[in-house]
Each structure stands twice: as C-alpha cells, then as structure tokens.
C-alpha cells in the first residue's frame, strides 16, 4: 500500500466524526485534500465548512460544498487537518503548506481536533524529520532569523512563498523540540513572528493514522 492510499484510509475514517447539519472545520494539505474528496460524498449531510486556506476553499467549492467565513461562526464541532509530524502526545508540527496561522485560527474554533496522517508522520520527538515553519512579517525576516539562530536553530527562507496573509516563511532546521508547549510560547513571543508551526497548546484530540493494515484511531 502506498502513501496516498494510506492518506485516503485516514481521510475516509474521519467521515465517521462528521455529524449531520453541522459546519466542519477543514485544514489544508495533501491528506486534507483526500478528506475534502471524501466529504464531497456526504455534502448534503452538512451545512458547509470553514476552510483554513484559499487552496482548500477552492477544492471545497469544486465539490459543491458551501464555505463559510470564520468570522461568521462561533464554534465548530470538529476540525480535520493533517500534520507534517505528530508525537505520542498528539502534538504536531504543521505548516509545510504555509497555512499554519489560519489552521491555528480554525482549530481554535473547534471542540474536537481530528488529525489525519499516514504512518510516516509519526515521530517520538518533534523536529526529528521536518523543519519547523515560522510565519514572519516580511520586514522582520532578518531580525527573526537572527533570534532563531540564537535559540540554536538554522532558519532557511522559503523563497517564492507568500502566505495567504501576505507574510513569509522561515523553515527552522536543527530544532529538537523536547518541550513543545514552551517552545511554541517562546517563539510566538518573538517580535515579528505571526505564529510558528508547533501545535502543542492546542494539540489533536483524535489521531487517525493510515497504515498498511488499515486506519488506526488514537484517542
């Protein structure tokens, strides 16, 4: 079974958490694209979605699913999103698709965060296989970069990428994130940082892992 098939298994299993006549929060990325495709098969069951990226919005509309603005929704029953890495405590690194800030906003609206991944995304320590994305106000890029170096990281400017919010991304290598909650707070306190890709203060409630043996649910 290849990686795409495992992503589809996880995405399909997440449909079990979608209840009738609700608005669903949807993240972004390749695994979420599989979920959007699956959600299209039950689109008449739900009111619509709040999407965390313009790319996801576009795919949802192609499926004929109504997209709501986050400002018009007071809460969501569930938020479904992928991860670049996830640890046993259900904390994540996200932001490979540069949508981390909007993902945090929509996740904060949700009563339950369901993370869908294939088994390659599971790690013991965050930062093991994937650099940490940090969204930065453009004028602060160099200043933030120096601060990240002082903290032991090796930031790399993600050239040619502008976020949906008009900002830039620094991908920070060499971080072994042993205390994700404290690291998330510390980085978010750096002047010029919009947010960073550690999702520890608001981690996942349920993890659905696509494996060669089927979808494994961790709750």
From Swiss-Prot:
The active site is at residue 103. It catalyses: aldehydo-D-ribose 5-phosphate = D-ribulose 5-phosphate. This is Ribose-5-phosphate isomerase A. The lineage of its organism: Bacteria, Pseudomonadati, Pseudomonadota, Gammaproteobacteria, Pasteurellales. One of its GO terms (molecular function) is ribose-5-phosphate isomerase activity. The gene is rpiA. It comes from Haemophilus influenzae (strain 86-028NP). Pathway: Carbohydrate degradation; pentose phosphate pathway; D-ribose 5-phosphate from D-ribulose 5-phosphate (non-oxidative stage): step 1/1. It is an enzyme of class 5 (isomerase). Belongs to the ribose 5-phosphate isomerase family.
């Amino acid at each position: 079974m290849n990686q795409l098939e495992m992503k589809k298994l996880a995405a399909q299993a997440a449909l079990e958490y979608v209840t009738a006549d609700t608005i669903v929060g949807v993240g972004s990325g390749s695994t979420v694209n599989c979920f959007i495709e699956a959600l299209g098969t039950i689109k008449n069951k739900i009111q619509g979605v709040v999407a965390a990226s313009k790319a996801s919005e576009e795919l949802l509309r192609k499926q004929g699913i109504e997209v709501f603005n986050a400002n018009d929704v007071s809460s969501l029953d569930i938020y479904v999103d992928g991860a670049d890495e996830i640890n046993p405590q259900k904390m994540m690194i996200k932001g490979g698709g540069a949508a981390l800030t909007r993902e945090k906003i929509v996740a904060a609206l949700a009563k339950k965060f369901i993370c869908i991944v294939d088994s390659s995304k599971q790690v013991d320590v965050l930062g093991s296989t994937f650099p940490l994305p940090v969204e930065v106000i453009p004028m602060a890029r160099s200043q933030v970069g120096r601060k990240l170096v002082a903290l032991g990281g090796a930031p790399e400017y993600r050239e040619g990428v502008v976020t949906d919010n008009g900002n830039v991304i620094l991908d920070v290598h060499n971080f072994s994130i042993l205390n994700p909650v404290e690291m998330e707070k510390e980085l978010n306190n750096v002047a010029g940082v919009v947010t960073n890709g550690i999702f520890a203060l608001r981690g996942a409630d349920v993890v659905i892992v696509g494996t060669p043996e089927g979808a494994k649910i961790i709750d």
